């Protein structure tokens, strides 16, 4: 039998870990996933009810329900022909030469399902957060990340073989000739991309990916395509700069995107179109289309038709469904209570920053200014993004609706370039069990769905709530001061606001945090301290600040606080899924998240009488304190 002094995670969650079962259609079960399952059940019933009693007074929700009904009309889906998919494939098949491809770039972006072998995006400018910038990156890889392509990776061959076989079967369904050769050619192009692709560690340090290049310099370096004309077609003007997020890809552009590789690029585009179409037709094709993803994570069976129907609707109407969910399930009492906790947590942070022992007063004061400028959003947004008023279902097929929606969404992406950034917009729907900090707007967002037990409940004690949602709130605040967020000022701009000596001291703290987790063994392999450092800084800051706030309450119970902390990180997952997370997820494995941060807190040792001989013991000189 385990003891808290040896393993907080395993002891607190012992009964749950023994009894919890991973759903057959998921790679894991966790405190988060349990709420997701509850929400799915509620929303499926809600949308089915709305299907019978159409919300004619809510035009956006009405369109979502129409699409939901179409997604669930399996009689029509089973009979639907593939002419629209074949039409999309033909848009690429008829590009016989690289010259044809060059002459059709704009058409492919705005009026086809074919992805280009490079990507332009419109994001808030990291150095001018009120305006948008044009970003440039590579096209993404077939395997989860670059580490999977190492020859010593145990799953490399089986995953690539499975993808090729699965993709050729999909292509054959759409009557594509030479399906096996096309799948093999796509893999050849994918392999060419690997050396120039960012690693997961590089993506994790997103503040370091901001590489602005004047548009003239950017387009002149690329000889094989007329990117100047494409950019003008995309954003209807000539920006003064392009932000390159994947340097190696940009440097390698002409050696990858050229006449010699055209047949490989063409094959790669065809596979993307075909795979992307599998969700919109008959049941056999839907099952076939999801097979690779299930094999990757060792998921036992496909999502049910009902869940798929909800998933597909959410993929286009997420904020619409979120707003409906928030208004139905999130009460004013809970909103007021969570707002009170956010205010309390910010006050705790103010006090901790003012007493910080390793920052100069000047930097601490600027940190407090940034803290005071953080805007919290709780529950659900006040309004929907305007784009939803444009999404209208038609009399055509489910796939044809999706094509139209994708065109509208793509056009909207580039249309935003000439507008100011709306810092009140939400990037997560209210029914998503999650929370986030946005560095470019300096906002923290807590959707309604996470504001449920075990994270939060009006029925739980204050210590339980601080051990749950309190740590999540403080975690998101801490992201303003993690290795990425700390580089953004109170306005959301990438801007050096620290004194040099303070930032150097912070970098030393980061190294200590990396060392604390790096190489720690889990059942799926060792943790990568560099990949997960930002989230670990936020976890440590979160539990530290929430603990301080919990102690200020009259009914403080630190055993309940630490137990609740361990409960929110409970998780069981397939080994394959855990291995994938180790390679690419910026969060630490669940058990390490639960067990390591408390060992840096004196109160943990006092509460559970942890001794030097216990496994959870960390010597005082090795206990890390950042915020």
Curated annotation (Swiss-Prot):
InterPro entries, alphabetized: MetalloPept_cat_dom_sf, Peptidase_M13, Peptidase_M13_C, Peptidase_M13_dom_2, Peptidase_M13_N
GO BP of this protein: protein processing
Named cofactor requirement(s): Zn(2+)
Domain Peptidase M13: 1-627
Keyword Cytoplasm carried by entry: no
Temperature dependence: Optimum temperature is 30-38 degrees Celsius.
GO MF, one example: metal ion binding
Cofactor, how bound (note): Binds 1 zinc ion per subunit.
Listed EC numbers: 3.4.24.-
Uppermost EC category: hydrolase
pH dependence: Optimum pH is 6.0-6.5.
Active site, renumbered: 476, 539 (proton donor)
Record key words, sorted: Hydrolase, Metal-binding, Metalloprotease, Protease, Zinc
GO CC entries: plasma membrane
Highest taxon, organism lineage: Bacteria
Keyword Cell membrane: no
Coiled coil start-end: none
Binding-site positions, Zn(2+): 475, 479, 535
Function of the protein: Endopeptidase with broad substrate specificity for several oligopeptides.
PANTHER family cross-referenced by the UniProt entry: FI17812P1-RELATED (PTHR11733:SF167), ZINC METALLOPROTEASE FAMILY M13 NEPRILYSIN-RELATED (PTHR11733)
The protein's assembly and partners: Monomer.
Family according to the record: Belongs to the peptidase M13 family.
Protein name: Neutral endopeptidase
Species this protein is from: Lactococcus lactis subsp. lactis (strain IL1403)
């Amino acid at each position: 039998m385990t003891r808290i002094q040896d393993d907080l995670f395993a002891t607190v969650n012992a009964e749950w870990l023994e009894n919890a079962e991973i759903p057959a259609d998921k790679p894991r079960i966790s405190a988060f996933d349990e709420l997701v399952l509850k929400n799915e059940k509620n929303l499926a019933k809600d949308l089915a009810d709305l299907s019978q009693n159409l919300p004619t007074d809510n035009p956006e929700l009405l369109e979502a329900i129409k699409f939901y009904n179409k997604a669930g009309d399996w009689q029509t889906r089973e009979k639907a022909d593939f002419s629209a998919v074949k039409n999309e494939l033909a848009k690429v098949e008829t590009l016989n030469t690289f010259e044809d491809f060059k002459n059709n770039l704009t058409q492919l972006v705005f009026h086809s399902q074919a992805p280009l072998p490079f990507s332009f995006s419109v994001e808030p400018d990291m150095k001018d957060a009120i305006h948008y910038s044009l970003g440039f990156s590579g096209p993404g890889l077939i395997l989860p990340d670059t580490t999977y392509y190492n020859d010593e990776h145990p799953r490399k061959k089986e995953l690539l073989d499975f993808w090729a076989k699965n993709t050729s079967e999909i292509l054959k369904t759409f009557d594509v000739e030479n399906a096996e050769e096309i799948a093999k050619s796509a893999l050849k192009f994918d392999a060419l991309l690997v050396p120039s692709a960012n690693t997961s560690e590089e993506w994790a340090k997103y503040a370091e990916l901001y590489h602005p290049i004047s548009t003239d310099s950017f387009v002149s370096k690329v000889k094989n395509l007329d990117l100047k004309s494409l950019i003008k077609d995309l954003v209807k003007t000539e920006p003064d700069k392009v932000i390159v997020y994947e340097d190696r890809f940009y440097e390698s552009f002409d050696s990858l995107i050229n006449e010699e590789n055209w047949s490989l690029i063409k094959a790669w585009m065809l596979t993307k179109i075909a795979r992307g179409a599998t969700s919109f037709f008959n049941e056999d094709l839907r099952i076939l289309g999801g097979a690779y993803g299930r094999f990757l994570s060792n998921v036992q069976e496909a999502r049910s038709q009902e869940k798929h129907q909800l998933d597909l609707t959410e993929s286009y109407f997420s904020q619409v469904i979120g707003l409906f969910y928030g208004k139905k399930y999130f009460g004013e009492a809970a909103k007021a209570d969570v707002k009170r906790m956010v205010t309390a947590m910010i006050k705790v942070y103010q006090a901790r920053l003012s007493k910080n022992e390793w920052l100069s007063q000047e930097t601490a004061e600027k940190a407090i200014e940034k803290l005071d400028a953080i805007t919290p959003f709780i529950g659900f947004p006040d309004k929907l993004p305007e784009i939803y008023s444009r999404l209208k279902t038609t009399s055509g097929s489910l796939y044809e609706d999706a094509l139209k929606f994708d065109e509208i969404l793509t056009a909207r992406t580039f249309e935003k370039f000439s507008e100011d950034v709306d810092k009140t917009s939400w990037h997560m729907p209210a029914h998503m069990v999650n929370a986030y900090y946005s560095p470019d707007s300096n906002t923290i967002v807590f959707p309604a769905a996470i504001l449920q037990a075990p994270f939060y409940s009006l029925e739980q004690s204050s210590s339980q709530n601080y051990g749950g949602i309190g740590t999540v709130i403080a975690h998101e605040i801490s992201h303003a001061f993690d290795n990425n967020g700390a580089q953004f000022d109170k306005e959301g701009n990438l801007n050096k606001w620290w004194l040099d000596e303070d930032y150097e001291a912070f970098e030393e703290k980061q190294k200590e945090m990396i060392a604390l987790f790096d190489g720690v063994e889990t059942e799926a392999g060792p943790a990568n301290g560099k990949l997960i450092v930002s989230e670990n800084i936020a976890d440590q800051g979160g539990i530290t600040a929430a603990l301080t706030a919990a102690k200020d309450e009259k009914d403080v119970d630190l055993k309940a606080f630490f137990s609740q902390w361990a409960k929110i990180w409970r998780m069981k997952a397939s080994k394959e899924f855990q291995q994938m997370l180790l390679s690419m997820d910026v969060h630490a494995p669940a058990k390490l998240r639960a067990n390591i941060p408390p060992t840096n807190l004196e109160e943990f040792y006092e509460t559970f009488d942890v001794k030097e001989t216990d496994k959870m013991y960390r010597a005082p000189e090795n206990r890390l304190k950042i915020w």
